[in-house]
């Protein structure tokens, strides 16, 4: 029973973690450039085309679009879906390992790991020279 509970909880938390990872991508992309997190809505940085709902699904959209913008065919860095997927796993894994037995501890562990990883990523990005590419 606990195994099924753990797996179902992890299956719920995996896409939630990927969505949080996608949001953290936006934060790390926009904040250093002084852009708002709310406006304009998600868009291609090259052609400025607003992304549709089906282009906003973490990891799956990247695969469906073959890693390119639908508007201008600009390549989307491979690091984006990797970080989104790892964010999903980071939130889901503590629950899969025993979340139903210790739900609060599993959620706190997953959230702390996720935040820690993204804080480290933000520090790494802040130390990267402004002109270098980010994938």
Segments (PLM) and residue ranges:
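A membrane-topology feature that recognizes alpha-helical transmembrane segments
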Residues: 1-135
